[in-house]
């Protein structure tokens, strides 16, 4: 079962108050809750991304495929920390769960091929173990579909970039599912996170007003189309 757990003891509960208070120090402004929140929103809307590096989120991610979790390693802004379940110490030869894509699940012939391949891998791992091959070697057979677990510590600025890219309709379906689940979890975590999620955790095309992808899904016009229209108006 896919699950995203926010570690409340470590995750910033009031990110807007934190941003506003720190920004207020820079400006020598009066510090209070309402002014801090207003100042934070103003900073974010003005594009001062540096202040978004202050709030941190700590997560336990479980039930997603190793393939999907690999995508998190490509988001390196703000030096995020990732700790993933070890393939050297967990007894995967006793069996492992996999994430099956809907395209396979909804195709009986494809599903038969898929599950046979997974079964063959499990049998091969058991056979290699019996032959004395160490766990750190026979677990190299694990497929990218196997379900893994991860701790992810990430700041708001990196999360905004992540959400802009991974809530896009062209993102891989499972990482898009993860993004939407995380957005929902943070919206329920605190009122300030709800504001942030609604305003910032959107596809990039919604944020900038046009599509930057080479293959556009049609949700927004492409950048060249928008620039062309602006040029005609000028």
Where are the model-predicted features located?
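Family-specific signature for flavin-dependent thymidylate synthase
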Residues: 1-234
